[in-house]
Structures are given as structure tokens and as C-alpha cells.
Amino acid sequence: IFYHYFSRYMPFLSKDKLNAQLPVLKKKFTTYAAFRETKDINDLNPEFAGKAVETKTVNELRSGIFLSMPKGYEFVPFAIEDQSSVIQDIYISPEGTLVYVGNFRHFVSDMGASLANTGRALYGWDQTGKAFSKAGYLPLSVDIDPRKLEQISAGRLILANNSGDLMSIKIPGLNAGNEVQ
């Protein structure tokens, strides 16, 4: 996979990670400087020329929800505050409160860590305006890598991170109607 980065295409994986998957590259790219000049899949191995199965283009990078409508699905992006970090997991309560966790520190080095938003709780979905009426940030430290949310009791979720640690978090207003406390 290649991505566009400052006017050129770069492999999504680092030289070391690609070498682990394709050992033939160890001989072809003996230095990081040589690997840095890679522009497409044909540079990795000429045998790949013309064998790429498919090319895809991503046109929408915002996080949001898809609403089921009579004529198909409609994408509704989250607010700008919710676009500042990746979204790792989403929990939707029976009354419609949406809770998500974000942040991730282990991207490839070109992309850097994503520590802008640990997560939020979004309350009071307005079908007419297609937006949530209230929101609150989660009481989480930026240095965790949250992965999974599950409800354990009214107003309380359990969060699992990448290292297997579990953390109980209280979400104001969860299962208490749509009001933020």
C-alpha cells in the first residue's frame, strides 16, 4: 500500500516491516536512503509489474456515522472536535448516547502519534439537524491506547487497551436519559 505524502507516494510500511514480509527486499534495498526513493510497487519488485489486483482511492477521511435511509445510507460526519484523532471503538447505548475512544501512538514514523483526542460522549441525537446536541470529553489520559469499550453497569464502561489492561470509566449521563451531568 502506498500513500500520498508531501507530493510523492511512499510505502505504508517501513523498510524493516516490508523486509520481514518480503525477504527479497533485503538485497534490493540495503540502505534506508535507497528505500526512501521507492515510488510505487514496481520499485519494490519488477515481478509485481502489472499484477496489482486493484487500485483504490479514498475520498472521505472524516469520521462519522451512516444513517439507514429509505433510499440507502447517508453519511453524516462528526463535529470538527471529533476529527482530530483516530476512532478506535464506538459504543452506542440503548438511548442513543454514542461514546468513542481515540488516540493511537504506534503509527509508522512518518505519520507520528495521534494523541489529539482520547474520546468523547455524544448525547441527544437530533434527527432533523442530523447532529448531537451535547458532548463531553472522556476522563482519560492521552498516553493510553484504547481499543475496546463495553458497558459493565449503568453509567460505567470498561475500556481495554493494547497491552490488555482494563480500566473502568464513568460516563456522565450514560443510561440516565440524554442529559449531560
Language model features with spans:
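Acidic, glycine/proline-rich Ca2+-coordinating loop motifs
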Residues: 1-181
